[in-house]
């Protein structure tokens, strides 16, 4: 079991019940109920949400073609899938269900949501682990690509991105690079 999630809490409860010879252990609705009341800026959210979305994203490294992500989103044929990947990871980490992040398949829709919810920082900011990073490859002010911040180290932001050459891979960019449009700040900016 890695990270803290509703699924992991349920698994723990089932293991405890089995080891004790009981039908059930604990309240299966406790974790989802409690998670609804944590604000996105508190230490609980920063630790569990940020680390968890990164761990989920890293577990997908090497996935080619992204069918798992774009079909989860509801598409019946391949589409550009970087935003589907980020949304899928957010859903797996419980961030969609808690209203921390939107489900989006088009990068500008994600940018618009974070801006509308006061959760946007420009590309010169220093992100925290788990932030959503939006890119503008051609300098037109419109996001072309999105990924998840893995970590920041020595002036470089390291990411996990879906649809980076049609695969989930890790990349690195200098903080303040002109190609970084901005970041979500749902949990997430220092």
Predicted regions and their residues:
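Short Gly/Pro-enriched turn/cap motifs at secondary-structure boundaries
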Residues: 25, 76-77, 136-140
């Amino acid at each position: 079991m890695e990270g803290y999630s509703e699924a992991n809490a349920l698994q723990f409860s089932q293991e405890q019940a089995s080891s004790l010879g009981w039908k059930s252990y604990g309240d299966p609705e406790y974790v989802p109920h409690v998670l609804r009341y944590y604000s996105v800026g508190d230490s609980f959210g920063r630790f569990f949400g940020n680390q968890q979305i990164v761990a989920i994203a890293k577990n997908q490294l090497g996935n080619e073609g992204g069918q798992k992500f774009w079909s989860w989103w509801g598409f019946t044929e391949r589409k550009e899938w970087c935003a589907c990947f980020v949304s899928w990871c957010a859903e797996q980490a419980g961030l969609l269900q808690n209203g921390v992040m939107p489900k989006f398949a088009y990068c500008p829709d994600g940018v618009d949501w974070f801006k509308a919810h006061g959760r946007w920082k420009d590309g010169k900011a220093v992100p925290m682990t788990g932030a959503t990073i939006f890119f503008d490859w051609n300098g037109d002010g419109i996001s072309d690509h999105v990924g998840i911040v893995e970590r920041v180290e020595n002036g470089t932001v390291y990411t996990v991105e879906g649809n980076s050459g049609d695969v989930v891979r890790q990349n690195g960019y200098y903080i303040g690079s002109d190609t970084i449009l901005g970041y979500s700040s749902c949990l997430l900016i220092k």
